[in-house]
């Protein structure tokens, strides 16, 4: 038995012509009976067979025949007269089919020769190893289960148009193994997080997606209307206030992995619809949260990749080492050491510096900004992008942390952190504000900012205040951006690479 060199059939007609030819083949199939049968149940997967019989040589397989049934998409076909090969890809991997008229019958063999790449096919047969050593299925029964009308991208060029990969993710998944690996890693990451939370006695919950009042984050919401109730509603920007209501209700450890929606810009790090994991634990604070978050992320990397040392965009990131901790001003002075303590406490100086970096300090968010908010803005310009190694930035100002507990020792500061790595925020957490009067006052301040033109300022949530008035235990809470975490673990440069169906402009 001989095998030809693997080659891709040349495309001699444009795509429309190919589709027309395939539709004609489909018409013929319909005339023969059921064009899309659904009575074949594969009992084996390609990757499992490849792994199980990796050490079985040709003689061993001949001495102990193994019957298998496999189904998948035909990715390559080589017709050689009285013997042909096909590479078939299922959800686990690929395996080769060997087809002859003696084994499957002349009629089936003639039909097989007309099948196209992309068709879903199925076979029952016996495993053997070719002269070149490739594990293959010697087909005894061969069937066409689903006719593909559109041709797959060229094997050697693949789906080179990046936007087309996002827009037609189904094609990208067919032809790009790396894409399939990315989303398998995403699933492993989320499974790891769920297991970690379960082992720490957290209860997974689901809270509303439609909110009468948007809250839990500084963001612009999507607005909709509930017809039956005749009321304006908002797609949630965060689940925080509902999860903390559950803490009030007596569930002392809760978490939720779900979608948030923010009506804001699209960038390599931002998608209007994204996945967050938020968790809350009674009788903890932000220092406990930092330790817990560090352990969780480290374990997620190990479970998804088998190691805590990862490569991201050509640079190493070691999650096994203890994460750094810096205040906002410490981070600024680490990466911009010329700034003095006095300058970083000078309102006029900070505003001048921000203007130098191109920040519009006349916008509503800056009109009444205090020193803390200005320092945070300068941090974003000077230090944030430099935080490659995992670093907790701690002690955020009260004015930009309306839901966080104030420090008992440092006026104007909250017990809050944000976790950065590779120059981007991954998590945000804090000791929760459980003083209802303080929370009401901060909500009022947010409303004033909204009235002044800050679209991302929060609304006043009277029901949440009422919940706090029943008493919420001391609590710590944290949100982790699942998409950004998966970006790091899969070496993906943009958030679109880790979303199965990212938002794009309409094709027209």
Curated annotation (Swiss-Prot):
Enzyme class: ligase
Named cofactor requirement(s): Mg(2+)
EC number: 6.1.1.6
One Pfam entry name: tRNA_anti-codon
Residues at which Mg(2+) 2 binds: 425
Source taxon at top rank: Bacteria
Gene Ontology, cellular component aspect: cytosol
Keyword match Cell wall biogenesis/degradation: no
Alphabetized SUPFAM superfamilies for the sequence: Class II aaRS and biotin synthetases (SSF55681), Nucleic acid-binding proteins (SSF50249)
Chain positions recorded as Mg(2+) 1 binding sites: 418, 425
Cellular location(s): Cytoplasm
Reaction equation(s) it catalyzes: tRNA(Lys) + L-lysine + ATP = L-lysyl-tRNA(Lys) + AMP + diphosphate
Gene Ontology terms: biological process: lysyl-tRNA aminoacylation
Protein keywords: Aminoacyl-tRNA synthetase, ATP-binding, Cytoplasm, Ligase, Magnesium, Metal-binding, Nucleotide-binding, Protein biosynthesis
InterPro entries in alphabetical order: Aa-tRNA-synt_II, aa-tRNA-synth_II, aa-tRNA-synth_II/BPL/LPL, Lys-tRNA-ligase_II, Lys-tRNA-ligase_II_N, Lys-tRNA-synth_II_C, NA-bd_OB-fold, NA-bd_OB_tRNA
Cofactor binding remark: Binds 3 Mg(2+) ions per subunit.
First-listed, main subcellular location of the protein, grouped into a coarse class: cytoplasm
Subunit architecture: Homodimer.
PANTHER family: LYSINE--TRNA LIGASE, CHLOROPLASTIC_MITOCHONDRIAL (PTHR42918:SF15), LYSYL-TRNA SYNTHETASE (PTHR42918)
Family in the record: Belongs to the class-II aminoacyl-tRNA synthetase family.
Protein name: Lysine--tRNA ligase
Organism: Burkholderia cenocepacia (strain ATCC BAA-245 / DSM 16553 / LMG 16656 / NCTC 13227 / J2315 / CF5610)
UniProt lineage: Bacteria, Pseudomonadati, Pseudomonadota, Betaproteobacteria, Burkholderiales
Gene name of this polypeptide: lysS
């Amino acid at each position: 038995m001989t095998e030809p060199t693997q080659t891709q059939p040349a495309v001699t007609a444009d795509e429309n012509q190919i589709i027309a030819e395939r539709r004609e083949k489909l018409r013929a199939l319909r005339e023969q009976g059921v064009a899309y049968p659904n009575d074949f149940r594969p009992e084996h997967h390609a990757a499992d067979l490849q792994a199980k019989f990796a050490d079985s040589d040709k003689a061993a397989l001949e001495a102990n025949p193994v019957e298998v049934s496999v189904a998948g998409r035909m990715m390559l076909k080589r017709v050689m007269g009285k013997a042909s090969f096909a590479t078939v890809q299922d959800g686990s991997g690929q395996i080769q089919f060997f087809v002859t008229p003696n084994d499957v019958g002349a009629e089936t063999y003639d039909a097989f020769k007309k099948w196209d790449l992309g068709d879903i096919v199925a076979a029952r047969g016996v495993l053997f190893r070719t002269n070149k050593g490739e594990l293959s299925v010697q087909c005894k029964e061969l069937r066409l289960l689903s006719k593909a009308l559109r041709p797959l991208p060229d094997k050697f060029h693949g789906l080179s148009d990046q936007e087309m990969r996002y827009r037609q993710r189904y094609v990208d998944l067919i032809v790009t193994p790396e894409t399939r690996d990315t989303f398998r890693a995403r699933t492993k990451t989320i499974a790891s997080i769920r297991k970690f939370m379960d082992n720490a006695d957290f209860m997974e919950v689901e809270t509303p997606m439609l909110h009468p009042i948007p809250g839990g984050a500084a963001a612009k919401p999507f607005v909709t209307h509930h017809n039956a109730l005749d009321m304006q509603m908002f797609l949630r920007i965060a689940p925080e206030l509902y999860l903390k209501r559950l803490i009030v209700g007596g569930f002392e450890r809760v978490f939720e992995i779900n979608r948030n929606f923010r009506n804001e810009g699209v960038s390599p790090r931002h998608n209007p619809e994204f996945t967050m994991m938020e968790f809350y634990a009674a009788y903890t604070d932000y220092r406990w949260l930092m330790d817990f978050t560090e352990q969780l992320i480290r374990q997620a990397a190990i479970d998804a990749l088998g190691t805590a040392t990862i490569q991201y965009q050509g640079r190493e990131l070691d999650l096994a080492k203890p994460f750094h901790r810096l205040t906002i001003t410490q981070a600024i002075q680490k990466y911009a050491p010329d700034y003095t303590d006095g300058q970083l406490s000078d309102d006029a100086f900070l505003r001048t510096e921000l203007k130098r970096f191109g920040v519009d300090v006349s916008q509503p968010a800056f009109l009444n900004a205090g020193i803390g908010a200005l320092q945070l803005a300068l941090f974003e310009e000077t230090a944030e992008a430099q935080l490659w190694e995992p670093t907790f930035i701690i002690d955020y100002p009260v004015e930009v942390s309306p839901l966080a507990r104030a420090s008992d020792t440092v006026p104007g500061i909250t017990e809050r952190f944000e976790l950065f790595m590779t120059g981007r925020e991954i998590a945000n957490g804090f000791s929760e504000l459980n003083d209802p009067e303080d929370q009401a006052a901060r909500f009022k301040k947010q409303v004033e900012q909204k009235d002044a033109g800050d679209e991302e300022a929060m609304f006043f949530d009277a029901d949440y205040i009422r919940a706090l008035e029943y008493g919420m235990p001391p609590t710590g809470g944290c949100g982790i951006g699942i998409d950004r975490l998966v970006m790091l673990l899969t070496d993906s440069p943009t958030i679109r690479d880790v979303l199965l169906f990212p938002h794009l402009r309409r094709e027209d």
